[in-house]
């Protein structure tokens, strides 16, 4: 082989080897440059810088742990906070507070406000019901007192009526009695005959003016009234004395007709009874054959 060609080949191989070696050296230098360089000492040396770094790292770790603890807070603590007396106080939300914690505290506060509003409404309703109950009791007590007074008044009026009737009966009895000695059978018969005439006259007339009745039997008007009252009490005479000074005799059959009329109608007013009285009661004098 030609020596010149051989020399050229060897030269090329050498160049290639040198190029590869140069490239490897170039790659090693950047890696060495990327390694941390020694910190230049400033104002107190490396010890102070490292202390600052450690303090910051501890602060970040504490903040992370605090945030995790707040997010994992148990529901029991929430219920305890709801029962606390100062929960309704104004809460100052910190700008550094987490969004989840802020939302929980806001929800807790709203829940407490709603609970207080419901409690307030219940208290108002309870107070109103108590007032209504007291008012109802007052009304019932007033009605019971009025009923008691009414019953006492009715009882008193009934007692006075009975007492008055008894007094009238005694007066009537005394009017028909004969006083003194010398009482005999003929005088008793005359008295009974006079009483029968008195009753018969009223029954036949049906409606008699008390003054005319007294004049007919030569009695005082009050004496005639007393006799009628006594006969009514004994059941020998039935009727009513109206406000015009007349006595209206009502027979037993007419009383039964009135009772039957009232029973058929159920409830009858005085006006209706007065309107139908002409059909139920015969007011015309009875002709004695």
From Swiss-Prot:
**What GO annotations for molecular function exist for this entry?**
ubiquitin-like protein ligase binding
Give the bilayer topology.
Single-pass membrane protein
Q: Where are the transmembrane segments?
A: 3-23
Q: How does it assemble?
A: Interacts with Atg9; the interaction is transient.
The lineage's top-level taxon is: Eukaryota
The terms describing its cellular component in GO are: endoplasmic reticulum membrane
Q: Where is the composition biased (Basic and acidic residues)?
A: 87-166
Q: Which residues lie on this side of the membrane: Lumenal?
A: 1-2
Stretches for region Disordered? 65-168
Composition bias, Acidic residues: 70-85
Q: Per the record's keyword annotation, is Ribosomal protein included, yes or no?
A: no
Q: What is the lineage of its organism?
A: Eukaryota, Metazoa, Ecdysozoa, Arthropoda, Hexapoda
Q: Which UniProt keywords apply?
A: Endoplasmic reticulum, Membrane, Transmembrane, Transmembrane helix, Ubl conjugation pathway
Q: What is this protein called?
A: DDRGK domain-containing protein 1
Location(s) in or outside the cell: Endoplasmic reticulum membrane
| InterPro entries in the record | DDRGK_dom-contain, DDRGK_domain-containing, WH-like_DNA-bd_sf, WH_DNA-bd_sf
User: What function is annotated for this protein?
Assistant: Substrate adapter for ufmylation, the covalent attachment of the ubiquitin-like modifier UFM1 to substrate proteins. Required for ufmylation of Atg9; protects the nervous system during aging, possibly by stabilizing Atg9 and supporting its function.
Q: Which residues lie on this side of the membrane: Cytoplasmic?
A: 24-289
**The family this protein is said to belong to:** Belongs to the DDRGK1 family.
